[in-house]
């Protein structure tokens, strides 16, 4: 055995590749072993070092793969089982136990996270050369007993199913130990690179190979200064020191110091030595020169997007200088956080890259299909789960328009639960739906699912057969084939991997659960968890790509240019935590009680030395230039500067602040069309808030001119954010069809309010006729109609019964009317709403109870009112009352709070009550002596009082009574008849002259709106009260109206101070009237 070490400025790959080449020339078969995470990059690096760039005698691989070479054809091996298979085995085992059988884990036996922890522990036991029986140092005897029960039963099932119950490395070691491979091990050399520790399983294998006389060469990085030191704790080389010293002691071999022909730049050598001195408490006189600082830089950036943008620009610059993509390595502090930004921005800059991290299959349509199918069963046919299943593209032969109609009906009829999905649809909205076609589609879609779902607990093979029948009935394979037609080779390979994962899980289920009785829900849960946990196996599509991976997988001298992103304190260093079923304390006790080659790894104990060595490797990862970037905001939160970067700053490494300047005339902008186009669009969307130099003005004017020429050739235009809220005039033919010239224009008070809220809202509702999707569930409209009907019946009841009897009778009659019975007895939610409405009716009815001088003249009085033969106003008055003096009043029931506001009325937003007064005066043919005492709202509610604001309990009835009163506008002459407390008269009393003025101005509002509507030009002008915010309907999804950009288009309401409001607005109305008179 040879143990080699070298200073980090030298290249260990060159040294070990040379040793491998010498052994190959001597006729040896050489295995060059690298860690799992580095094997791909290591293979390329080693082969590039060899003069021939290839060798049949040297195999670059991993420990486990090397074991396969020797035991691949051994007849005693069992069938391989993957993690999904192990999950199934543990699930089967745990299902066989009762809660009482497992004293500690009994309540967790169906928990998916717990099962995954068991699988991890199972694999860790194999890697640690331990058995479950050696877990005798646990803090709880019951915990040990449970684990022994579980793992013993697992081993029994694996043996009975002829599965591998040991790893390939363990089987290889066993064969070596028994002498079955002595011949194969002759003339064998093993070179090991990139390790700072071995697992117990790997170390045991190395010991057995060493005993058989196999040449073993192990290399690592240690400085001579560190090797000679007697104290290594805290040293940046502690991980490799402990590693090499442990091997030297065990195998009685003295480590040798070696050097390579290649040596790193002085900048990186000095940086390493300064970093080492910081942690071994020694003095160093080394200083980074200005030339050294050109090779190592820290970038201080604003956020992740800016960070990746700057890196992408720098990569483009390297290409501009003649370098290749493969010369660049990008390292990430948090790979998950950067994956999306890297993908979007590198694509924009046309940078091909390989992301060295497993990609989940979870977004594939087949995984969506399995996920939705399981959720349909688990949640008993929720509408969203059923529709997601149908939308997967793999279910049946459903056309998109059929799917849209089905979804619309499911939403309308609130179809949920298998009972509703399996029965004919019967509810209709006045003929809106084609129930015959929908029920035909429902039967086609639901029949296969109905057959599958009704499966009772049975043997696994029987469930598989029924699933196969289901998949055939819905044409899954044909749909999958159509799905993958015409895709790229990369996508094709991904589709094949997903399908293989799907079939392998089913095969393993057949093997493990074939003769076991289980429920369909459990089977679908296993299938879903397996598919969601699966990852794609990805390899670079090309050699010339930028490699992107996590920084903790880096090695010294990895590439010419290295960018390390996200180097904040949260991720650099990374603190690994133990989340397994065996605590660190228990692991330490077990290690003390077992031999050296049988031990648990204690990752938390390794954190410090591993992080130091990783940081040292990172600082030496580049051979020409290293850039470490530090975002001020990472994952939408501020983070601190890494302690390692603070050390570098103290050593003199420069920190460059990278701002967000997108206007600079840089060469990389010229060399990349997509990035230039993207930046021009970005600039076009935002105001340029800085002055450009003459050089920058020239650059951008030439760049934009070039882009316009290129886009014109391709028939493209630069998209713009529309700062103009301009609409097209509706065609004259459309307006003539909608509003014939020879007929008056139909309006209502609600239509008028809509017009003055936002003219475009009126266009959508009354010209296009757009409506919100309805449902059978009662909404505010249904609630209002219900309460209207109750009060209508109460007021019509002329019997001698007391008021409460009349009210209860009215509620009972209303509840049994078909229109309400159908709506409010659909489900518990509807019945709950009905109970609330009954309470509201009883509370509000107290206004009508007792001594009341008012008599109901009529209910639901429809009217038509003509204005100048040009406008026809239609509406329905809820109730007309008559006072004892014969004057009439108007009552409008409201399910929400409403009052007559003079300011809103002036601005066209509250015309209802005044319109009703005009309609009553016109329809009843009232003369000048007939009076209308008022028009008012009655808020139907169950008043709630905040007791915290009550000064005394006696005030509660007064407050409640105040809330349950008529609010609107009242005639001053009738004030004496309205003083019974049921009418809110404060600031609501108007003289007859003032009422006439309101009526006249109301007509003006209608005429003005009708004139604008006839033109067919509808503005996007939601109203604003203060000119700073918008209160009107903005219709953002349609108009893209944004208050900060389009405020000039909003209609600012005319407002007056509170004290001047009444007289001021009346004066304005009078002046408008006089202006009209003068014009005439």
Swiss-Prot record:
Cofactor(s) needed by this chain: Mg(2+)
Keyword Manganese: no
GO molecular function: 5'-3' exonuclease activity; ATP binding; double-stranded DNA binding; helicase activity; hydrolase activity, acting on acid anhydrides
GO biological process, one term: double-strand break repair via homologous recombination
InterPro entries found in the cross-reference section: ADDB_N, DNA_helicase_suRexB, P-loop_NTPase, PDDEXK-like_dom_sf, PDDEXK_AddAB-type, Restrct_endonuc-II-like
Gene3D superfamilies: 3.90.320.10, P-loop containing nucleotide triphosphate hydrolases (3.40.50.300)
Additional remark text: Despite having helicase-like domains, this subunit does not have helicase activity.
The protein's assembly and partners: Heterodimer of AddA and RexB.
Record function comment: The heterodimer acts as both an ATP-dependent DNA helicase and an ATP-dependent, dual-direction single-stranded exonuclease. Recognizes the chi site generating a DNA molecule suitable for the initiation of homologous recombination. This subunit has 5' -> 3' nuclease activity but not helicase activity.
Protein name: ATP-dependent helicase/deoxyribonuclease subunit B
Organism: Streptococcus mutans serotype c (strain ATCC 700610 / UA159)
